[in-house]
A protein has these predicted regions:
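Short, charged/polar, low-complexity loop and linker segments
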Residues: 1, 28-37, 61-76, 118-129
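Leu/Val/Ala/Ile-rich N-terminal alpha-helices, chiefly Sec-type signal peptides and the beginnings
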Residues: 1-53
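Amphipathic alpha-helical coiled-coil/helical-stalk segments
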Residues: 78-80, 85-87, 92-173
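Terminal, compositionally biased segments
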Residues: 1-18, 147-190
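Conserved alpha-helical segments that form or flank metal/cofactor-binding pockets of metalloenzymes
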Residues: 51-58, 97-98
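Short, charged/polar micro-motifs that form catalytic or ligand-binding hotspots
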Residues: 3-6, 39, 46, 71-74, ...
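Surface-exposed polar/charged interaction patches
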Residues: 23-26, 30-33, 63-66, 101, ...
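Residue-level signal for the start and early helices of compact helical domains
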Residues: 51, 69-72, 181
């Protein structure tokens, strides 16, 4: 297996950050009506965040198992990428919670009366603020995920540059030489 290209990993993390940013915008701007419409519009967002979280987890495993882990300063980047995995997972949880708060229109158990329009309206009115809160929390976590990916990409680039700087051979420079007679005054005999 060829060695991991850290420059390529940094670029892939920048791409992942852009995907988190795009999903953040989609979650922030999602428009829905409680019920089936909300399920139809929020479900793809949940699936996408799970995909991005899995990608972040794969990147974390690749970097942790590479020569990058031996470079000074890499721990901060690895921990930051682990926080991206956590934040994106929390975003998925928030989207799932929005779906859980969604008022579904299924039939009640046998023997219970079906909801009338006033009850449905009240259920929707209760659900909307909860769903909106969960969606706002998901958007926040996605924003943190994007920022984390940018930080890690920058950290990799910085750590590589520092490591290359340390491996350069040291060139000694010599200062100007002074002639011994020019720097001393002659002795006076008595």
């Amino acid at each position: 297996m060829p060695p991991l290209s850290l420059v390529e990993q940094a670029q892939q993390l920048r791409d992942l950050a852009r995907q988190f940013e795009a999903l953040h915008a989609r979650v922030r701007d999602v428009s829905y009506t409680p019920g089936t419409d909300a399920l139809r519009r929020i479900s793809p967002l949940l699936l996408k965040v799970q995909d991005l979280m899995a990608t972040a987890l794969v990147r974390l495993g690749a970097l942790d198992g590479s020569e990058y882990a031996d470079i000074a300063g890499s721990r901060a980047s690895l921990e930051c990428l682990a926080s991206v995995v956590a934040a994106s997972s929390l975003a998925g949880n928030d989207l799932a919670s929005a779906l859980y708060a969604n008022p579904y229109e299924g039939a009640p158990f046998a023997g219970y009366p079906a909801d009338n329009q006033a009850v449905r309206t009240a259920r929707h009115a209760e659900a909307i603020p909860r769903m909106t809160g969960h969606l706002a929390d998901a958007a926040h976590q996605l924003d943190l995920s994007a920022i984390g990916c940018h930080y890690v990409a920058t950290g990799i680039t910085r750590d590589l540059a520092a490591a290359q700087e340390q491996t350069k051979p040291v060139q000694r420079t010599t200062g100007p030489t002074t002639a011994p007679s020019a720097s001393r005054t002659p002795r006076v005999r008595r």
